[in-house]
Amino acid sequence: MTITDLVLILFIAALLAYALYDQFIMPRRNGPTLLSIALLRRGRVDSVIFVGLVAILIYNNVTSHGAQMTTWLLSALALMGFYIFWIRTPRIIFKQRGFFFANVWIEYNRIKEMNLSEDGVLVMQLEQRRLLIRVRNINDLEKIYKLLIENQ
């Protein structure tokens, strides 16, 4: 096993740990989930570039008769990238004392101001940061509003 294979195993393990955390552990942290809303995906250009580069590496490894283990590891990396970028749905998860947005815990008392833009983006102003929450279904904004009013 080469150092390349070890690095690939490390990246695959990191992506797998992230996927498991995002899917199973994060919804169970900080109490029961009150509301979970699907968000719009960000630009997919980065993901196309990543999966494309891995596909080029697979092709290069196969045509140069590289190690079969490396080909399998690159394929697993491409599949993990495909899952994380295209199959997994980004979500905002509301709890009793705060919410998870982009895998970051934010307590409700950190929200200084909230606005709704004309194109349906909920803007939350924190102390030093602005969150742009783009929901997939525009009707979910009303659910978020009701939940925030109940918990304030």
Curated annotation (Swiss-Prot):
Q: List where the protein spans the membrane.
A: 6-26, 45-65, 67-87
Give the main localization category. membrane
Keyword Transmembrane in annotation: yes
Q: What UniProt keywords are attached to this protein's entry?
A: Cell inner membrane, Cell membrane, Membrane, Transmembrane, Transmembrane helix
Q: Which domain of life is it from?
A: Bacteria
Q: What is any one of the record's Gene Ontology cellular component terms? A: plasma membrane
Tell whether Transmembrane helix is among the UniProt keywords. Answer: yes
Give the bilayer topology.
Answer: Multi-pass membrane protein
The subcellular localization recorded is:
Cell inner membrane
Q: Which family does it belong to?
A: Belongs to the UPF0266 family.
UniProt protein name: UPF0266 membrane protein YobD
Provenance organism: Salmonella agona (strain SL483)
The organism that produces this protein has a lineage beginning with: Bacteria, Pseudomonadati, Pseudomonadota, Gammaproteobacteria, Enterobacterales
